[in-house]
Curated annotation (Swiss-Prot):
DNA-binding is among the record's keywords: yes
Gene from which the chain derives: radB
UniProt record similarity statement: Belongs to the eukaryotic RecA-like protein family. RadB subfamily.
Leader sequence segment: none
Superkingdom in the source lineage: Archaea
Keyword Cytoplasm found: no
Pfam family, one: Rad51
Alphabetical keyword list: ATP-binding, DNA damage, DNA recombination, DNA-binding, Nucleotide-binding
An individual GO BP term: DNA repair
An example Gene Ontology molecular-function term: ATP-dependent DNA damage sensor activity
Name recorded for this polypeptide: DNA repair and recombination protein RadB
Function in brief: Involved in DNA repair and in homologous recombination. May regulate the cleavage reactions of the branch-structured DNA. Has a very weak ATPase activity that is not stimulated by DNA. Binds DNA but does not promote DNA strands exchange.
HAMAP family linked: RadB
Amino acid sequence: MLEELLNGNIEKKTITQIYGPPGVGKTNICILSMLNAIENGKSVVYIDTEGSLSIERIKQLSGKNCEELLKNIIIYEPSTFEEQSEALEKIFLLENIGLIIIDGIVSLYRLELCDNINENTKLNRMLGKQISNLLKVARKKNSGILITNQVKDSANGIEPAGGRLLEYWSKSIIKLEKAESVRKLTLEKHRHAKEGENLRFRILQNGLEIINKSY
């Protein structure tokens, strides 16, 4: 799916960010990107911060017995932002990693924000360190990075959560929207592909159906 929009695979050694509201289909796209990496002979790290990853959905989208597929997926399910940091540290020890996915990059971060300035400063530093470690491990392993992000209200409607830090370090940013049964991916930022391109699709039980691609 993302390959269609980006005119190629997810770029190595950089961050690709997909943002959109809950239930719009971000995890489905993560699973398809994961399956594509596995088909290319690589393993995938999947950090699931929101409990969105479903083994049954992997089976539906792969159309195969997923026992063999699961051998190539390293899944982490952190319940705190500190555990998310620890999961990223563990990736340095893994081999043959083609793609690192964090489904809900700031979900746990936002849960732990509070009225204490010192605690929030600590969280911001931890987020910065996580982004740094992500890029270090991706460059070391020659891996792609795919993150999903929540949205927040802004003067222009909605925008990605996580502030300018995630916006700056994400070399590709893709907005995912939903109108009834149709979803739309829009490429908002990219170093090589044409910004503004969009792809409309439907989510089916056994996959995603592309409706059209426009510019």
